[in-house]
Amino acid sequence: MKKKTGQLYEGAYVFSVTLSEDARRKALEKVTSGITNYGGEVLKIHDQGRKKLAYTIRGAREGYYYFIYFTVAPEAISELWREYHLNEDLLRFMTLKASAVKEVLEFATLPE
């Protein structure tokens, strides 16, 4: 039997700033356990901290940003998205196919 290999993805997740540190850790764990529950593997998590949002989302002006590199079967992505939509702690998410895991993320500073 041929072993399935997963596609590499980069996920961007923005969590509510109203969460305590412990609640934020649990919300992030909920996202990562969802990936592993569908047979995926979390490769790298980048915590980008608290940042200002480009626009208001559900009354929030700021959010906690995380970037997660993971592998999972492509057919599992739609199920993960369904779970993300039901997660009230998650303000926004985006999942993209990735070509490689970035060890360091660099962003240009935007003028205020």
Curated annotation (Swiss-Prot):
Q: Which SUPFAM superfamilies match?
A: Ribosomal protein S6
Record-annotated membrane-spanning stretches: none
**The organism sits in which domain of life?**
Bacteria
Name any one GO molecular function: small ribosomal subunit rRNA binding
Which InterPro entries is this protein grouped with? Ribosomal_bS6 (IPR000529), Ribosomal_bS6_sf (IPR035980), Ribosomal_S6_plastid/chlpt (IPR020814), Transl_elong_EF1B/ribsomal_bS6 (IPR014717)
Q: Which GO terms describe its cellular component?
A: cytoplasm; ribonucleoprotein complex; ribosome
Q: Does the keyword Transmembrane helix apply?
A: no
Which HAMAP family does the entry link to?
Ribosomal_bS6
Q: So what family is this one in?
A: Belongs to the bacterial ribosomal protein bS6 family.
Please give the name of this protein: Small ribosomal subunit protein bS6
**UniProt organism field:** Chlamydia muridarum (strain MoPn / Nigg)
